[in-house]
């Protein structure tokens, strides 16, 4: 791999600066953990994934005949699903990437470090590890059962053992030596039996597998001239990295579910009066109540399905740790964590199931702007709780906190969400340090900038001097998996980018953010003005109506690309932004080609400084703070993907002209302000490869968006008729759904820039 942000580039930089030993030391401590999620922004059938793989190989081989055949096959292969996938279907779809891509890419990274940067004694099996949500993420998805969770974990174990079996089979043909051949044959046979076993035990345990391979290594080294030692070491490294778990399956559930469960549990423990009052008690009273009573499901005999399912998810975690090892399932994530009680309720659930001192990390997820602001006081409260303090001691005094970019942006706008997340990280580190807790962050980032995405390497590099990034954990969602991690080369390249950004933040780079008091005040003011502009826009009387009638939000569920409902559970069928998930919210604006969540409020906030003769303060911020430059750079991407000609007909619409013009004005203002700050003449002029990729994609999918808008207009007119023709309504809805599915999967239709091309794109250090 060549180019900026690769390991080779990192090696060259460290050598020039006489920091080679420092780099090795840093690489021994870095941990990168991409977590694959099945968020419904893309869902390719296995047949399509196979074609993509073959097509990639044909392109590399310059085999024009094969390319033409495969493109024809792709054109005739159905992308859409007649019915929604099950959570297990989603898991199977993503394990394809684990088995065929990540397994090789992560191994290649370890090989490169050992042969080019460090030596063969280099040890850091956690340098790149994997997380996995399909089959474990229950938040808003009633179709994820405990049976599916266990089935998914066994699938992960089966797939990794299958990969080991393939590698051992190749080795067996080479290791035909005395005292070695019979051992490798025994390993091969027992691995073959193991990958079809659906029980806790396997024909060969992980410890025994390692022991036998180390015996082979020693024997070959001592008696057989170290023949094929590289291949033996590579397999041992893979086993140390992936174990029998392949990827760690996370459990996630909404805090409101836990609250309901506890009310039902207490109904059985105390008298009905106490239970019915549980929701009316203060948080402190609830904490005292659940602390005062020892609870066990062995004595309570729960019958409520919600209680059984929730407690059963903990039993499933215990079962998975038994079959796949502790790393197989060791994190319980609490969505919409709003209080210390939310964390302590989950900890209590482990006690109820009889799992005392659980080998599990309880992970609060803070999402809204208010939750982010309260996160510090929440964590201080649990750090002071004696029971939770004991739990943390059993977890090496380490706490993971997850921060949600998608819902934060939906709630407070692009600039405010990103700035509040950064400030929360700083404050959470301080409070954790005060109590002797090592804090790790897990970033819930989506693909587009509006959901925390954009240039991930720039994002983490921009943290230098502000946040420690030796441990990077982030979600990889939807189309980002296939576009950035879909092939071995692109996967390795993007993983190296993450490693590089982490290393650069450990004194290997002079690009540090200078968060002086003046710059902080400027950021706070920008955030304040941006939030006001975004909030005023959200409160516009036509905001919800515009989204409901003129976007494709309501049709996301009909594409059948994900098992999870597009809305959170609600007591009403009324269109509400509170119950709307971030993915269809951002997706709706994207399909409108307006990308509001990726820029709205940014232009207004910068312009406030401009109009008040304080633009020099923003210029200073842009020059001195890489984090701010990264925000603007990613916002440029949102602006570049916008195309207001598509909806220009709404400019004079009797219902939506005002709100359309508000959006268009903010778009133009943001573009004007960003260009003025950056010194660019055009958006993304510093990223020609990325810009060309975006433009090609937009060129291909614009007809689909045009069809959508035509069908939406037609549908709105039909519904105004006294007796609308049902068949015409059905045709329009089908047009919208089909075109939506095509545009969601559009990244299949163009070749993304290669790692080499992307490495030439740079972010300016200042205007």
Language-model features: where?
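Often metal-dependent polyanion-binding catalytic scaffolds in large enzymes
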Residues: 1-287, 306-309, 330, 360, ...
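Conserved structured core elements
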Residues: 92, 96, 100-103, 107, ...
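Generic, well-ordered alpha-helical scaffold segments in large soluble proteins
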Residues: 101, 105-112, 116, 163, ...
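Catalytic or ion-translocation cores adjacent to nucleophile or general acid/base/metal-coordination motifs
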Residues: 146, 152-169, 353-522
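Acidic, glycine-enriched catalytic cores built around paired aspartates
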Residues: 245, 250-252, 257-259, 274-302, ...
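Metal-dependent catalytic core segments for phosphate chemistry
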Residues: 258-296, 356-357, 379-394, 400
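Conserved mid-sequence domains
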Residues: 276-369, 374
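Conserved small/polar residues in nucleotide/adenosyl-binding loops
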Residues: 750-757, 767
């Amino acid at each position: 791999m060549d180019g900026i942000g690769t390991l080779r580039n990192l090696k060259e930089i460290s050598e020039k600066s006489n920091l080679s030993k420092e780099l090795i030391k840093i690489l021994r401590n870095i941990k990168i953990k991409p977590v694959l999620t099945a968020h419904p922004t893309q869902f390719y059938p296995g047949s399509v994934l196979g074609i993509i793989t073959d097509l990639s190989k044909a392109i590399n081989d310059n085999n024009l005949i094969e390319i033409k055949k495969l493109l024809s096959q792709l054109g005739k292969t159905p992308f859409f699903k007649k019915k929604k996938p099950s959570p297990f279907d989603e898991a199977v779809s993503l394990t394809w990437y684990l088995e065929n891509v990540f397994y090789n890419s992560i191994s290649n990274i370890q090989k490169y470090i050992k042969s080019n940067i460090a030596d063969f004694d280099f040890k850091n099996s956690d340098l790149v590890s994997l997380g996995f949500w399909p089959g474990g993420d229950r938040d808003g998805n009633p179709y994820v059962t405990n049976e599916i969770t266990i089935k998914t974990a066994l699938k992960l174990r089966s797939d990794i053992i299958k990969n080991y079996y393939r590698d051992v089979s190749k080795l067996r043909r080479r290791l035909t030596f005395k005292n070695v051949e019979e051992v490798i044959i025994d390993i091969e046979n027992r691995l073959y039996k193991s990958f079809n076993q659906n029980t806790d035990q396997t024909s060969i345990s992980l410890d025994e597998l390692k022991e036998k391979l180390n015996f082979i290594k020693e024997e070959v080294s001592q008696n057989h001239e170290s023949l094929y030692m590289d291949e033996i070491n590579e397999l041992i490294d893979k086993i140390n990295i992936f174990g029998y778990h392949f990827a760690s399956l996370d459990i996630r559930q909404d805090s409101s579910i836990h609250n309901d469960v506890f009310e039902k549990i207490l109904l059985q423990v105390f008298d009905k009066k106490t239970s019915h009052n549980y929701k009316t008690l203060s948080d402190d009273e609830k904490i005292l109540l659940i602390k005062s009573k020892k609870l066990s499901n062995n004595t309570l005999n729960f019958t409520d399905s919600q209680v059984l399912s929730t407690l059963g998810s903990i039993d499933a975690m215990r079962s998975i740790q038994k079959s796949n090892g502790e790393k197989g399932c060791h994190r319980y994530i609490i969505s919409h964590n709003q209080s210390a009680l939310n964390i302590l309720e989950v900890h209590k659930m482990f006690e109820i199931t009889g799992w005392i001192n659980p080998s599990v990390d309880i992970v609060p997820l803070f999402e809204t702007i208010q939750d982010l602001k309260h996160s510090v006081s929440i964590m201080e409260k649990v750090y002071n709780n004696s029971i939770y303090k004991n739990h943390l001691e059993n977890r090496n005094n380490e706490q993971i906190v997850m921060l949600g970019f998608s819902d934060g942006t939906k709630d407070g706008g692009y600039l405010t969400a990103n700035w509040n997340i950064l400030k929360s990280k700083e404050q959470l580190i301080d409070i954790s340090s005060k109590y002797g807790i090592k804090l790790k962050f897990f970033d819930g980032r989506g693909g587009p900038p509006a959901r925390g995405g954009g240039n991930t390497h720039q994002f983490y590099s921009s943290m230098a001097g502000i946040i420690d990034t030796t441990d990077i954990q982030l979600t990889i969602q939807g189309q980002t998996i296939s576009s950035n991690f879909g092939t071995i080369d692109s996967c390795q390249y993007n993983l190296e980018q993450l490693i590089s950004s982490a290393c650069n933040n450990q004194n290997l780079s002079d690009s540090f953010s200078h968060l002086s008091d003046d710059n902080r005040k400027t950021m706070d003011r920008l955030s304040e003005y941006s939030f006001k502009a975004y909030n005023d826009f959200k409160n516009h009387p036509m905001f919800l109506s515009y989204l409901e009638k003129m976007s494709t939000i309501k049709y996301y569920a009909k594409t059948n690309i994900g098992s999870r409902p597009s809305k959170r559970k609600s007591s009403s069928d009324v269109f509400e932004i509170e119950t709307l998930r971030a993915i269809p919210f951002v997706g709706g604006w994207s399909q409108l080609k307006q990308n509001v969540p990726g820029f709205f409020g940014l232009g207004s906030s910068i312009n406030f400084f401009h109009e008040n003769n304080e633009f020099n303060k923003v210029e200073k911020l842009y020059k001195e703070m890489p984090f701010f430059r990264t925000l603007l750079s990613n916002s440029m991407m949102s602006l570049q993907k916008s195309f207001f000609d598509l909806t220009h007909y709404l400019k004079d619409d009797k219902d939506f002209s005002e709100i359309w013009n508000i959006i268009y004005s903010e778009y133009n203002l943001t573009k004007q302000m960003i260009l003025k700050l950056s010194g660019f003449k055009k958006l993304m002029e510093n990223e020609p490869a990325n810009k060309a990729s975006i433009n090609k994609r937009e060129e291909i999918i614009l007809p689909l968006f045009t069809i959508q808008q035509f069908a939406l207009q037609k549908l709105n007119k039909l519904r105004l008729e006294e007796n609308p023709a049902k068949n015409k309504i059905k045709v329009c809805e089908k047009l919208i759904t089909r075109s939506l599915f095509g545009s969601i999967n559009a990244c299949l239709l163009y070749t993304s820039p290669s790692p080499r091309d992307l490495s030439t794109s740079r972010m300016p250090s200042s205007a």
